[in-house]
Amino acid sequence: MPTPSAPSPQPKGFRRAVSEQDAKQAEAVTSPRFIGRRQSLIEDARKEREAAAAAAAAAVASSEPGNPLEAVVFEERDGNAVLNLLFSLRGTKPSSLSRAVKVFETFEAKIHHLETRPAQRPLAGSPHLEYFVRFEVPSGDLAALLSSVRRVSDDVRSAREDKVPWFPRKVSELDKCHHLVTKFDPDLDLDHPGFSDQVYRQRRKLIAEIAFQYKHGEPIPHVEYTAEEIATWKEVYVTLKGLYATHACREHLEGFQLLERYCGYREDSIPQLEDVSRFLKERTGFQLRPVAGLLSARDFLASLAFRVFQCTQYIRHASSPMHSPEPDCCHELLGHVPMLADRTFAQFSQDIGLASLGASDEEIEKLSTVYWFTVEFGLCKQNGELKAYGAGLLSSYGELLHSLSEEPEVRAFDPDTAAVQPYQDQTYQPVYFVSESFNDAKDKLRNYASRIQRPFSVKFDPYTLAIDVLDSPHTIQRSLEGVQDELHTLAHALSAIS
């Protein structure tokens, strides 16, 4: 597919780049309203992690001595209490452990599991280890057993069993992934451009209802956009398209040309999600699904695992065409969709989603940060020059100029570094990560994902649109059989053409 043969710009200062635009564009780029940015997946993921950590800390703090059963978490099962207990030994003598174990023997507790772990709260002069025991004891003996353990051990507390967070196993279960972040809802946020516009707020509710009612397998309902909405789209479309030839990566340019040819991408009409979804399905297997706003990080990333991109249908307020505090269809259709039409980038996006399934809150926050610095704000090298591939850049006139100017710092993409890099959500990014190629980024991401601690691996089955959980020799063997069938087909094809 040929790409526009426009000369690539040399990096220049951001202010110089802005000064070369017309007055209206320059004002939009530098105005405070434009510089503010939508809430990110990272912020949502961090809030989820901090809330979970606070709940766990509160549970630990409330399990100090007093009432032996106060704040103890256990499961009732046929008259028995089943629980997890953590404790540290009192002193360093070998007999310390035997005294603790003797307590469980005295009460005839059935021990299911016993292990040592690094102590979360090591005590001075004590081994930096603690003991985890899962046991079962008659419910009537539980209080006495806990009191006895506390007499011979330190830092005794119950612990919830580490459970893998729920995640969808089949694509239809994405109907359950609808947790929205409401901070930038025009009904709730005083700073939202549409807060004082009752007509706009009512329009948003009408379009949001489409997403709330949508179920997997249904065609995405069409939206009849108003003249004002189309005018807003036109201003964004024309302004950004003028930069793509010199600032966007070749994959975005090729995808954008195809969308103009086959999906009705043009300045005087907003594409319908159903038409775009059908096009993507044929190109890379990705599908669109309507969403009413900004999804929680875990739900959004889980959707990517199924090659489903959650996409808004509403458009930003007419008073702020160059900026939206939340994702809207300009951001999705102009930034994300052309990139999802590329097979390698589509696989990269799905890999991030697969890595998120069953991951801890801490890992979700890190993956969201990797997503932020790649899929949203990533740069790549092409023909020795920097180009933009992140949707946050390709749908933001000001940041697209800024990212390829001399002002920001550019670092080589490394998932371990990007995962903990502080991000900027109030102005333009001071740091961007550049990938040598999408294949290189994909390989680095897979290496990073392989080190995420989960008691299983996952594999997407493209025939059933389901997630295979590889947690036993049997499930792995079954998956290998499918790979062997594919290899046989490829080997036959090679022999046929050689």
Curated annotation (Swiss-Prot):
Its EC number is 1.14.16.2. Phosphorylated on Ser-19, Ser-31 and Ser-40 by several protein kinases with different site specificities. Phosphorylation at Ser-31 and Ser-40 leads to an increase of TH activity. Phosphorylation at Ser-40 activates the enzyme and also counteracts the feedback inhibition of TH by catecholamines. Phosphorylation of Ser-19 and Ser-31 triggers the proteasomal degradation of TH through the ubiquitin-proteasome pathway. Phosphorylation at Ser-31 facilitates transport of TH from the soma to the nerve terminals via the microtubule network. Residues 1-31 are annotated as: Disordered. The record marks 425 as: Important for substrate specificity. The keyword Oxidoreductase applies. Inhibited in feedback fashion by the catecholamine neurotransmitters, especially by dopamine in competition with tetrahydrobiopterin. Phosphorylation of several Ser/Thr residues in the N-terminus regulates the catalytic activity. Ser-31 and Ser-40 are readily phosphorylated to activate the catalytic activity. A cysteine modification induced by N-ethylmaleimide (NEM), inhibits tyrosine 3-monooxygenase activity through the modification of the Cys-177. One of its GO terms (cellular component) is smooth endoplasmic reticulum. Fe cation binds at residues 331, 336, 376. Keywords: Catecholamine biosynthesis, Cell projection, Cytoplasm, Cytoplasmic vesicle, Iron, Metal-binding, Monooxygenase, Neurotransmitter biosynthesis, Nucleus, Oxidoreductase, Phosphoprotein, Synapse. Belongs to the biopterin-dependent aromatic amino acid hydroxylase family. Homotetramer. Interacts (when phosphorylated at Ser-19) with YWHAG; one YWHAG dimer binds to one TH tetramer and this interaction may influence the phosphorylation and dephosphorylation of other sites. Interacts with NT5DC2; the interaction results in reduced phosphorylation and decreased catalytic activity of TH. This is Tyrosine 3-monooxygenase.
